[in-house]
């Protein structure tokens, strides 16, 4: 048996969620060990949609630009029915003014994993590949994990906390005995990555709508390269592993009703769609994140992005507790915030999926006749864009009802405690450029520089290590984003969600917030 490894956090699983958590812990200066049963990052494309909120998180890691360069922006949506184009609408700037990344990026899971793994390697960290979790136990003081390497050597990892990022069949979840309730869509889905030759330019996410269902062609990096996704009919009786590629190709051609040639298939698979969430994201000193905690329909490409946000939410809380800057009760808010988000996500994706794939005659009529006719007009309206983009891109996720959101002073603002910090520019640059440090951010907005003197209350004293204080000009964009033209202060959590907001220069609100949440230096 090898020597015992001692660390702060043991992460089980090195998919997008586990790697994201590891990267965030690097930012926060927290020790960790990642164990992964596979030999390296996935070679398969798997998930492909990367949304604005994920790119904003990547930006803090210095990875956003490279992600965009490696992927393909979905410039528009093309709607087909009966083999003919029924409508088109632009997607290239659908979220303009709402995020630095106002689009949907097509970037395969394999490339996301390589990006994140590259970040770890560049910071001198690695993953224990070919290492499987065999069992674990926990006490009030910590967690002990027993793992086995590819050569059969057993090893012990002792940590303060364990996080299961080990997928939909999560051994960690099973060992914790946590229920994973939900439902299964009975029809079988298919997916293939291939070259598609047809009359259309490689510039759009193309959706072919039919009476029974749909076929979607997602443009990927590379000439005429697409991800093709669709559904077999209800009477299709084969098990997932028995389906031949030729059956998928025949189905695509039958549903699309257009002349096309599919070749150079890189990967294909079939699967059933499940919608489930765990009863709790936490049990003692163990946590679940990503597919280990929630799975849902592929509608809206939410899965990988949601797991990355799970990791982002948990990392800063673990860091504060492990460094002695907050009580362990802070970790309870991970389950509070992310379980509620998972429930909302499942409801939303289920509705989207039912509209896209439901066989009922009314849905069929709407899918093939009504939606293609009105979609272009609807998505030309700013009001629709400002509703749909935050919903799909995940920038609209909020924690307004959580215990970390203090609403005493936010009544007069458009932005509420629990909301993501809105995007706008300050002196020509993204406000997010000022918020990259892994700290709380106390921002004073004023039309007279220096009028809001936050340091007077001791932020540069007892909270000096935890809070970054800045005074920013109250520009037109800032005033519009927050809905006020008078001086105000906003305290952002380390994940850039609003904890507290108040008018004027009073220090009482945000200082009381930090007093409740943190343990100031010297206490």
Language-model features: locations:
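FAD/FMN-dependent oxidoreductases across multiple families
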Residues: 70, 241-306, 326, 331, ...
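Residue-level detector of alpha-helix initiation sites
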Residues: 15-16, 41, 167
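N-terminal Rossmann-like FAD-binding beta1-loop-alpha1 element of flavoenzymes
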Residues: 7-34
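Helical substrate-recognition/capping region of FAD-dependent monooxygenase/halogenase enzymes
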Residues: 2-8, 12, 28, 81-84, ...
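Conserved FAD-binding catalytic core of PHBH/FMO-like flavoproteins
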Residues: 69, 85, 118, 161, ...
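A conserved short coil-to-beta-strand element within the FAD-binding core of flavoproteins
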Residues: 129-143
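Active-site-adjacent segment of FAD-dependent monooxygenases/related oxidoreductases
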Residues: 43-46, 50-121
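Core beta-strand elements of the Rossmann-like FAD/NAD(P) dinucleotide-binding domain
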Residues: 5-7, 151-161
């Amino acid at each position: 048996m090898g020597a015992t490894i001692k660390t702060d956090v043991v992460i089980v699983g090195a998919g997008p969620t586990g790697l994201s958590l590891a990267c965030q812990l690097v930012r926060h200066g927290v020790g960790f060990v990642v164990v992964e049963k596979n030999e390296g990052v996935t070679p398969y494309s798997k998930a492909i949609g990367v949304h604005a909120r994920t790119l904003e998180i990547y930006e803090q890691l210095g990875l956003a630009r490279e992600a965009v360069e490696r992927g393909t922006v979905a410039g528009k949506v093309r709607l087909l029915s009966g083999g003919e184009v029924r409508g088109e609408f632009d997607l290239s700037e659908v979220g303009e003014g709402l995020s630095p990344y106002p689009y949907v990026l097509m970037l395969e899971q394999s490339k996301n994993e390589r990006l994140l793994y590259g970040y770890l390697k560049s910071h001198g960290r690695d993953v224990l590949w070919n290492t499987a979790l065999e069992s674990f136990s926990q006490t009030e003081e910590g967690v002990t994990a027993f793992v086995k390497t590819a050569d059969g050597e057993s090893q012990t990892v002792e940590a303060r906390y364990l996080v299961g990022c080990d997928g939909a069949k999560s051994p960690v979840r099973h060992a914790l005995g946590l229920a994973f309730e939900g439902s299964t869509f009975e029809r079988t889905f298919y997916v293939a990555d291939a070259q598609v030759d047809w009359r259309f330019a490689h510039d759009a996410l193309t959706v072919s709508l039919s009476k029974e269902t749909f076929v979607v062609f997602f443009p990927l990096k590379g000439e005429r390269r697409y991800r093709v996704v669709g559904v077999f009919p209800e009477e299709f009786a084969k098990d997932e592993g028995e389906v031949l590629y030729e059956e998928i190709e025949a189905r695509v051609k039958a549903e699309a009703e257009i002349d096309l040639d599919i070749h150079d298939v890189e990967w294909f698979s079939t699967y059933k769609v499940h919608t489930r969430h765990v009863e709790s994201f936490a049990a003692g000193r163990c946590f679940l994140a990503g597919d280990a905690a929630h799975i849902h329909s592929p509608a809206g490409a939410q899965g990988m992005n949601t797991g990355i946000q799970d990791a982002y939410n948990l990392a800063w809380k673990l860091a504060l507790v492990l460094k002695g800057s907050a009580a362990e009760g802070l970790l309870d808010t991970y389950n509070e915030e992310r379980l509620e988000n998972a429930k909302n996500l499942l409801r939303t994706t289920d509705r989207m999926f039912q509209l896209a794939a439901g066989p009922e005659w009314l849905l069929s009529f709407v899918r093939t006749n009504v939606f293609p006719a009105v979609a272009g007009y609807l998505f030309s309206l700013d009001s629709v864009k400002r509703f749909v983009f935050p919903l799909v891109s995940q920038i609209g996720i909020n924690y307004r009802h959580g215990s970390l959101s203090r609403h005493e002073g936010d009544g007069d603002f458009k932005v509420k405690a629990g909301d993501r910090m809105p995007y706008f520019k300050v002196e020509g640059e993204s406000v997010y450029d000022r918020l990259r440090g892994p700290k709380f951010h106390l921002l004073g907005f004023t039309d007279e520089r220096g009028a809001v003197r936050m340091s007077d209350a001791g932020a540069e004293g007892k909270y000096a290590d935890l809070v970054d204080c800045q005074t920013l000009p109250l520009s037109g964009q800032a005033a519009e984003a927050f809905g006020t033209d008078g001086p105000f202060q906003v305290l952002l959590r380390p994940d850039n969600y609003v904890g507290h907001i108040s008018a004027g220069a009073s220090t009482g609100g945000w200082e009381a917030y930090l007093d409740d949440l943190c343990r100031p230096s010297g206490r």
